[in-house]
Amino acid sequence: MQTLDRPNAPTQQPYPEPVYPRRPTRTVAVADVLIGSQHPVVVQSMINEDTLDVDAAVAGIRRLHEAGSEIVRVTVPSMAHAKAMEAIREKLIQTYKPVPLVADVHHNGIKIALEVAKYVDKVRINPGLFVFEKPQPGRTEYTQAEFEAIRNKIRETFTPLVQTLKAQNKALRIGVNHGSLAERMLFTYGDTPEGMVESALEFAQICAEQDFHNVVLSFKASRPQVMLAAYRLAARRFDALGLNYPFHLGVTEAGDGEYGRIKSAVGIGTLLAEGIGDTIRVSLTEAPEKEIPVAYGILQALNLRKTMVEYVACPSCGRTLFNLEEVLQKVRAATQHLVGLDIAVMGCIVNGPGEMADADYGYVGKTPGVISLYRGKEEVKRVPESEGVQALIDLIKADGRWVDPPSSH
């Protein structure tokens, strides 16, 4: 017996509308790359070369940019490193092309930041270290007067950088790390997402006072649960204050290998699925170029950016009528250059046609030794399994959607 009202049938769409609309933000320009608002989620990474080695740094930046990192960050721990950025930028222009660059500045870094701002498009600071408070052994609390004194020192120290970036039309990232909160934040809020958010807010409010809004925020942690809580809280807190700055997402120190990728996908992907996040960096203990495919894979899985063929394939079961794993690899090898297509490879007709209904093309086991080719939901032809992959290629060609793969040379 039916006990619930029948819901209205939704209009069929190629992809469902997101459950969580994307968080509205300002647009922040980093050279010619736009972050936030409705612009595509930006992928970025960081070189691991010493910035003082100009040739090595230029080579590292170029490798990352060619791999798909749209913005590249470099570490700038000293004034000498800051001055080296001038030569790095010039050599990039001479030997490659301009690349949007971010300088990473940490401990008591105002002089370094003011210098390097001349040569980069964005400066990243860590609020817990930028105006460094040396921990005092035995301290049990901060008085309100002490708290305000440090806040005034931060305003006095930080404001010149804000004014410089505003005058040069450059960007700032206020990048909080869970592991480096200032001592007074730890005393006041504990080692919590609240402390992370308040740490960023202190600096963001100074930017707002100076009418400088070319600001990106990040709240990174090595544990996805902590970073998820921090970003969600930050979205509520900053938006309530009208400081709708874009967010840079990342699980810091995610590690390496499969597990590092899983941690990054869980943290970054969950927030993106909730509509939170405007630029991402996957942090792996590997060559930086290996971070880039993971980042684009996360975006592809959420249908936020399409940079490869989307393959739909069942896990195989007793009903499968051909060697699914082998055939999928053959189909992938033949079609992986056709960026933008969705291709389904399904083992049988029980779930195949329904599960692949939104794919552009389908390859489905029909009977032993015979496969069916689909264009969308329409079965086009049945061919012997031995001819299946070539028949799929011919179908794509007949539809005018085939391009030859790029030359290996």
Curated annotation (Swiss-Prot):
Its EC number is 1.17.7.1. [4Fe-4S] cluster binds at C314, C317, C348, E355. Binds 1 [4Fe-4S] cluster. InterPro entries: Dihydropteroate_synth-like_sf, IspG_bac, IspG_bac-typ, NO2/SO3_Rdtase_4Fe4S_sf. It catalyses: (2E)-4-hydroxy-3-methylbut-2-enyl diphosphate + 2 oxidized [2Fe-2S]-[ferredoxin] + H2O = 2-C-methyl-D-erythritol 2,4-cyclic diphosphate + 2 reduced [2Fe-2S]-[ferredoxin] + H(+). Pfam families: GcpE (PF04551). GO terms for biological process: isopentenyl diphosphate biosynthetic process, methylerythritol 4-phosphate pathway; terpenoid biosynthetic process. Keywords: 4Fe-4S, Iron, Iron-sulfur, Isoprene biosynthesis, Metal-binding, Oxidoreductase. Pathway: Isoprenoid biosynthesis; isopentenyl diphosphate biosynthesis via DXP pathway; isopentenyl diphosphate from 1-deoxy-D-xylulose 5-phosphate: step 5/6. Converts 2C-methyl-D-erythritol 2,4-cyclodiphosphate (ME-2,4cPP) into 1-hydroxy-2-methyl-2-(E)-butenyl 4-diphosphate. NCBIfam families: ispG_gcpE, PRK00366.1. Residues 1-12 have a biased composition (Polar residues). Belongs to the IspG family. Residues 1-22 are annotated as: Disordered. Its cofactor is [4Fe-4S] cluster. It comes from Synechococcus sp. (strain JA-2-3B'a(2-13)). One of its GO terms (molecular function) is 4 iron, 4 sulfur cluster binding. This is 4-hydroxy-3-methylbut-2-en-1-yl diphosphate synthase (ferredoxin).
